[in-house]
């Protein structure tokens, strides 16, 4: 249970710290990594959904035994994003440097699986 608490606290805090600034970087991202973002609803919606998951990770961290089953969709969230970026990269639609964040998510996905199996039902 201690592993799960630590892993989910770190993931939640990391996510909040990384995602929150994106609310204020809409135009900067378009300039530094063209083309410009053309669908702000998708952009801000993506950030909002990801932040909601960070809150879920922090909730899981408070009581991993009680919220053990929520670890399953948390794993799907992490592996889903990593897999999406990998497919885009293989299609030459993503810069290799963008894979870093997908790699962090896959790492957290593996740690979430570890936490799931180490937390008693």
Please annotate each region the language model reported.
Residues 19-22, 57-61, 85-89, 112-116:
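Structural signal for membrane-spanning alpha-helices in multi-pass inner-membrane proteins
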Residues 13-21, 38-62, 73-79:
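Core segments of alpha-helical transmembrane spans in multipass integral membrane proteins
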Residues 62-68:
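Membrane-helix interface "capping/anchor" motifs
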